[in-house]
Amino acid sequence: MKALSGDANELSSLDGELVGILAGWGRFPIATAEAIHRRGGRVAILTIRHHAEESLEGIADIYGEVGVAEIGKAIDFFRHNGVRRATMAGKIHKKQIYH
C-alpha cells in the first residue's frame, strides 16, 4: 500500500480507484473524501471512534470504525478492501489516547 504524497497531480484523475482515508477529528477528512470523489475516485473510510464526524459514513463507499488503540488494524482493513493508496486526515486527540 502506498501513502498519498499530497501532490495535487497525484489525484488529477482517479478513474474509479479506491483510496483509503484513516479519519480523525475535524473537517479535513470530509474535504479529503470530497476531493477524491470530484476526481472520479471512491473512498474507503476507516474512522477513529470518538474522533471522526458521523457524516463520513454517508459519503464513504466503504466504511469502518476502530478505536484509537486499534489504529494498527487500518492496514488490514484497507488491504481487505483492495485499497492500494491511503492517507490519514484529521486530528487525534492525545488526551483520549491515554484513557
Where does each model-flagged region fall?
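Short glycine-/acidic-enriched loop or helix-start segments at secondary-structure transitions
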Residues: 31-32, 55, 97-99
